[in-house]
């Protein structure tokens, strides 16, 4: 049985301009498990390694500093090094429902809302200054969230989120226009 990368890209992220002139890329995903299970996929370093676009060890305390290092795949594909590390800070945390942090000048907000059916809604928002960030960020987060969804549902992932992001990139180009 093959577990190919998802082919449906009908759940594209939406881009809006914020009141302060920045841009917010927002995704919603219904996850088949409760927030406690999704929280593990968001915060466990081993699970993050499969989908998050950096190596990061969370210190889940408000104000904690974060370091985002290139992944092994980014080092291989794009020649990134330790010199390409970036930094951020935890701004809000309420396990297992809310994680917000900065990553350089960007803000990433992960909200998990449980429902009565034992599932949860993930609302992810990436806020940034440059509209040109929307296309590559949108394709990358879309692909990463597909891996996160599979992890939460205990489905195997035998596709590359990097390849998947490349396949989605044309769908996201319109966001940067």
Question: For each predicted feature, which ranges?
Answer:
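Short, highly charged C-terminal tails/helix-capping segments
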Residues: 152-177
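Hydrophobic pocket/interface hotspot
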Residues: 38-39, 48, 66, 90, ...
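Intrinsic-disorder/low-complexity, polar/charged segments enriched in Ser/Thr/Lys/Arg/Asp/Glu/Gln
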Residues: 22-28, 65, 85, 98, ...
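Beta-strand/loop substructures that line and gate deep hydrophobic ligand-binding cavities in soluble
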Residues: 3, 98-150
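Hydrophobic/aromatic beta-strand elements that line small-molecule binding cavities or substrate pockets
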Residues: 29, 55-56, 86-92, 107-114
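Short beta-edge strand/loop motif at the mouth of beta-sheet-based domains
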Residues: 26-27, 45-83, 160-167
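Hydrophobic ligand-binding cavity/cleft-lining segments
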Residues: 1-57
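A short, structured loop/turn motif at beta-sheet edges
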Residues: 35-36, 60-61, 91-96, 112-121
